[in-house]
């Protein structure tokens, strides 16, 4: 039987690692007492969550399983019909996203790694979901070229108001130069229609030797993307190497610099580039050195914690907390570390339809936790 495990008051710890041009404050949340309530435990490398219209929840496991949580109970049998994934290191099943017309058509979108050790990549498929099984699997995107590394896939997805789909595609680690090449999907955010076709207003449509699905480029390992309806902005975050994790505001056709500019160094300590700025390349709105290893992303618009309205929440794998970023007109003005008392790697963070925050902890014995107001 699961019990409420923590009661705490949000307290800021430090703000020495975030870098932006504008000065920021170290924040705390007076009166933001919270309780952290276990929702599901004993999960096998949980990666993300999907909230369903009927109040149930899909829990996506990297191993290729989708678990259904209904009325507080995780179904012992995973969703049937999930396509085969390439499960190795960071490869596996990443996200499940509901079609904008899911109530009418029952369509979902899955992002996952596919292929073999020598040839693998990020794939997106759509399928029909009847509440228990997937059927009518239709592959709508395969990142090109394939690669021989089991890391840096990206695979986060979000729909825009025009019903086009954005998908993050990582640089493949050993292929970082591809992030600057417009004939490759690696290190890019791509934008496609629901059937996989390319929107006519994509920024590079009509150019020779350019993949028309590319929406932005110069990215590394993107583990979070979201669309803010209030501002119309697309926010994305990505891992640096040793330092240089970033939050960016994404605009079509823009170059976000990797690996020509970076605020980090290589894992060996070697310099990746002499540049932190370069003409024609965008600066992050926020970067972290040393790295926090960001994963999962939500912009809070719930009612349970009104003092956090409009703030960004970023899961931190290495730092083992959730980072709250106070945003004003697209600029960070302060940060706060939350939920570090868990001592867990945070793989995903979402805002639920009930207005609570939901956290996914990483690993072979992962969990889903709900953050509720407390004393």
Annotate each language-model stretch with its function.
Residues 219, 332-353:
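Conserved blade-ending motifs and adjacent loop-strand segments that build the rim/top face
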Residues 23-175, 224-227, 232-240, 290-328, ...:
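Acidic, Gly/Ser/Thr-rich repeat motifs that build Ca2+-stabilized beta-propeller blades
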Residues 8-18:
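Bacterial N-terminal signal peptides
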Residues 37-40, 75-83, 133-142, 196-204, ...:
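Beta-propeller fold detector
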Residues 167-186, 244-246, 250, 368:
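Short, conserved, GDST-rich strand-edge loop motifs in beta-rich repeat architectures
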Residues 123-132, 181-195, 250-251:
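Beta-propeller blade signature
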Residues 1-9:
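Bacterial N-terminal signal peptides that target proteins for export
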Residues 23-35, 74, 133-134, 197-207, ...:
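Blade/loop signatures of beta-propeller domains
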């Amino acid at each position: 039987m699961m019990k409420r495990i923590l009661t705490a008051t949000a307290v800021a710890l430090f703000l020495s690692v975030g870098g932006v041009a504008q000065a920021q404050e170290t924040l705390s949340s007076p009166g933001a007492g919270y309780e952290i309530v276990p929702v599901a435990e004993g999960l096998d490398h949980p990666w993300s969550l999907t909230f369903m219209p009927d109040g149930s929840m899909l829990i996506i496991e990297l191993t290729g399983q989708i678990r259904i949580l209904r009325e507080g109970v995780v179904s012992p049998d995973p969703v049937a019909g999930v396509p085969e994934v390439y499960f190795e290191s960071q490869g596996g099943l990443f996200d499940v996203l509901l079609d904008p017309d899911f109530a009418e058509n029952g369509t979902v979108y899955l992002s996952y790694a596919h292929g073999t050790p020598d040839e693998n990549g990020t794939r997106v498929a759509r399928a029909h979901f009847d509440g228990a099984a997937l059927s009518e699997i239709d592959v709508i995107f395969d990142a090109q070229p394939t690669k021989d590394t089991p890391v840096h896939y990206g695979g986060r997805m979000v729909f825009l108001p025009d019903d086009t789909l954005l998908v993050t595609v990582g640089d493949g680690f050993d292929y970082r130069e591809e992030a600057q090449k417009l004939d490759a999907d690696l290190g890019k955010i791509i934008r496609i229609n629901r059937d996989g076709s390319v929107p006519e207003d994509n920024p590079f449509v009509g150019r020779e030797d350019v993949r028309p699905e590319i929406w932005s480029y110069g990215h590394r390992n993107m583990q979070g993307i979201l669309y803010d309806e209030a501002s119309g902005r697309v926010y994305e975050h990505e891992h640096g190497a040793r330092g240089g994790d970033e939050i960016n505001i994404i605009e079509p056709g823009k170059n976000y610099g990797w690996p020509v500019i970076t605020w980090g160094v290589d894992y060996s300590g070697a310099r990746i580039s002499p540049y932190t700025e370069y003409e024609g390349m965008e600066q992050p709105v926020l970067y972290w050195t040393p790295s926090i290893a960001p994963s999962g992303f939500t912009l809070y618009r719930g009612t349970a914690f009104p003092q956090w309205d409009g703030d960004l929440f970023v899961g931190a794998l290495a730092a083992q907390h959730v980072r709250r970023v106070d945003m004003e007109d697209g600029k960070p003005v302060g940060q706060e570390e939350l939920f570090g008392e868990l001592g867990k790697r945070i793989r995903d963070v979402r805002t639920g339809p009930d207005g609570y925050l939901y956290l996914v902890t990483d690993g072979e014995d992962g969990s889903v936790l709900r953050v509720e107001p407390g004393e």
